[in-house]
Amino acid sequence: VNHPQITPISQKFIPLIGVICVICGLGWIGVGIQAQGSQPKLKFDFGPGKVAPGYTQVVKDTIYDKNSGFGFEPGGEISCVARGGRDALRSDLCTSDKPFYFSVALPEGNYSVTVTLGDSDSGTVTTIKSELRRLMLERVETAKGKFANRTFTVNIRTPAIKGDGEVRLKDREKTTEWWAWDEKLTLEFNNSHPAVCAIEIKPVEVPTIYLLGDSTVCDQPLEPYNSWGQMLTRFFQPGIAIANHAESGESLRSSLAAHRLDKVLSVMKPGDYLIIQYGHNDEKEKGEGIGAFTSYKSDLKKFVTGARRRGGNPILVTPVQRRSFDAASKITNSHGDYPEAVRQLAKEESVPPIDLNAMSKLLYEAWGPDLSKQAFAPNDNTHHNNYGSYELAKCIVDGIRSAKIGLASYLLSDVAAFDPGRPDPIESFAMPPSPKANSVKPLGN
């Protein structure tokens, strides 16, 4: 499956308003893209059978373009079938034995997405990711003739900063990562037999968890790389959004210069959260006054102060460990004083801390020098694969609970307690890879 053609930001903004279409005498109303506050619920019925009242039909030839504002991304091998029956919504569906993408043009904001999954003729297994591979639904199974409705909340964004300016994007953010910034909501349907009958999308005003950090946090666009930030979405209920503004190669200083913090603060509302994890690239910076307890700590405080000024709740995360074992199979300290600087600032400013540095040390040592390789991308001791980032996301969740942070109330009921010293065996982990892959390491290795 190919990603959509990449175009410059200036050519990509699409003001779609009230597109009204009549096709094949069905008289359906097309998707109107308006300001979020007045935008109606968007309802799509997948398959060539009867169309449920109030829904827009989607068939295999419904390919996304800027005029319609919705459709499958080009390159998918999709089959849409009608099974017959009285229930217009569940009597037809679209499926594939390969991953496929469906996109809808929408303004920046948070959206509640409800999917109807299943097939009257066979069992189904569906995994859903959003935007740049954010895990929304890990595995939804339905038996033959059974259907499941699932709801999740997705954040979409643009580079524009309210008031003035825009985020200074890196080249990769304009190409392989463009889905993170375009004016579209993109869903990836994956696993052995994904089957989608319907999708409903509506704008919602809900609390948002913003993430800022480096390549170990950001939405990695390509396999085999992944981060805890793009796995974290799986563990939260609908009704709270996660907006991942982290980026590969970033330090506190470079994120400030690129206006990433400005962007987050421009959309942050009172009661929102900001989770901050830097250090991997900050420790490489050189010069007078540069150091863990000087420039790093001072810049980190700017993030804390900025969030609080907007009525937000900052959370400080110590940098995740690198895979660096000594002769005794213990993790060495590759971050110097930077984790301690985070701990100090958290205490001084009364900010809830998540000590991922300490938890990842326990995690890696539990695996040991050999098994730990299974949690990282090949020939990489910094960046994780799907399994490694999933386990680290569990560490973050455990840290949220341990720190008694308010957002713990938004965790899903099936999220069990996690002990980093006893990681899940890799044999128990099954995550279908997304289609696009690249062996080039993320920035900031």
Predicted feature locations:
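Conserved SGNH/GDSL esterase-like catalytic core that processes O-acyl groups on lipids
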Residues: 180-182, 192-194, 202-211, 216-305, ...
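Intrinsic disorder/low-complexity segments
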Residues: 1-39
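Conserved beta-strand scaffold positions in the cores of enzyme catalytic domains, especially
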Residues: 43, 242-244, 350-353
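Alpha-helical cap/lid subdomain in secreted, periplasmic
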Residues: 259-413, 421, 432-445
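Short, flexible loop segments at the rims of nucleotide/cofactor-binding pockets, characterized by
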Residues: 91-93, 250-255, 330-332
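Residue-level detector of flexible, active-site-proximal loop/helix-junction positions
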Residues: 142, 216, 249, 321, ...
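Short, structured coil segments at secondary-structure junctions
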Residues: 130-131, 236-238, 310, 349
